[in-house]
Design a protein with these regions (language model features):
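Residues on the lipid-exposed face of transmembrane beta-strands in outer-membrane beta-barrel proteins
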Residues: 1-3, 12, 51-57, 100-106, ...
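Repeated loop/turn-to-beta-strand initiation elements of outer-membrane beta-barrel proteins
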Residues: 5-8, 59-64, 109-116, 150-156, ...
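Transmembrane beta-strands of outer-membrane beta-barrel pores
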Residues: 12-18, 28, 57-59, 66-72, ...
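Outer-membrane beta-barrel signature, preferentially recognizing the C-terminal barrel domain
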Residues: 16-65, 69-70, 86-98, 220-225
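Outer-membrane beta-barrel translocator domains and adjoining extracellular loop/strand segments
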Residues: 21-29, 34-36, 67, 72-81, ...
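Gram-negative outer-membrane beta-barrel transporters
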Residues: 93-159
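C-terminal beta-barrel architecture of Gram-negative outer-membrane proteins
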Residues: 122-125, 140-184, 190, 200, ...
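C-terminal beta-signal and adjacent terminal beta-strands/loops
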Residues: 185-256
Length: 256
């Protein structure tokens, strides 16, 4: 193993984040018949400690990140009145988060290139009224580039995300598939890019929350499939002018 082939970096950072003016407000805002939002004038700044390790070897990479947040500011939903939920920020002890990412690039000649990645994350949270103190989840992703010819490329990208914990909310599993074609024509002067993102429209906003005296099931189903067409053309230099190129002072005098 050569020193150039292997690279590693270890870093640590600490920063203090102060609450925003919106989080410090004392009043309540009406968001919907079932949701009020408010601030908290007693909020304290949160301190974030972060330790990261990044390693690379040829076409493989590894990234590990550990974060501990002291007095973390978290927007916690509570029961305000019958069938009315109140969103209000508060400081909550020391919460810890760990994430791991592994990636690998694989080539099959000049025809097929695949970038594989696996992400794992877990958290340890202590919030009053929160039923889950620990939660984890993972994601698998594969980005494929297929060269059909020197002027045509096909992109097929897929991802799968397991059910996971994200803060106070539980996110259900999801998957998606994106496909695209890129054409380079007329001596690479004309470029046409066609893309269909989320082909099967599977990326919907869903999450659930189980807390003290309150349970929330959020679901937003809508059309997430999108189409993109991008066309570009490189124009030649339409304005060509002959410039005088003199080499001596006499040439310049003659030109004048």
């Amino acid at each position: 193993m050569s020193k150039k082939a292997f690279q590693s970096q270890l870093s640590y950072s600490m920063k203090t984040e102060y609450p925003t003016y919106n989080q410090l407000r004392a009043g309540l805002n009406y968001s919907s018949p079932y949701l009020y939002e408010g601030g908290n004038p007693d909020l304290r700044p949160e301190t974030r400690h972060e330790l990261s390790l990044l390693s690379r070897y040829m076409k493989s990479s590894l990234m590990i990140n550990y974060t501990a947040v002291v007095d973390q500011i978290i927007q916690v939903p509570t029961l305000y009145a019958d069938n009315i939920m109140l969103y209000r920020p508060d400081n909550h002890g020391v919460n810890k988060y760990l994430s791991l990412s592994i990636s690998q690039r694989v080539n099959w000649g000049d025809f097929w290139e695949c970038a594989l990645r696996m992400d794992y994350q877990t958290q340890w949270m202590r919030v009053a009224g929160f039923t889950r103190e620990r939660g984890d989840g993972y994601m698998l992703k594969a980005d494929n580039t297929i060269s059909l010819s020197n002027h045509v490329q096909c992109f097929v990208n897929g991802a799968y995300r397991s059910a996971s914990e994200n803060g106070l909310f539980r996110i259900p599993r999801a998957w998606n598939l994106d496909v695209a074609l890129n054409f380079s024509l007329l001596s690479d002067r004309l470029n046409i890019y066609l893309e269909c993102a989320d082909v099967f429209s599977t990326l919907h906003g869903k999450r659930t929350y189980d807390g003290e005296h309150i349970t929330m099931d959020y679901s937003r189903n809508y059309q997430t499939r999108t189409f993109t067409i991008y066309v570009s053309y490189k124009l030649s230099n339409l304005i060509s002018s002959k410039k005088y190129k003199g080499n001596t002072t006499n040439d310049e005098i003659k030109r004048l």
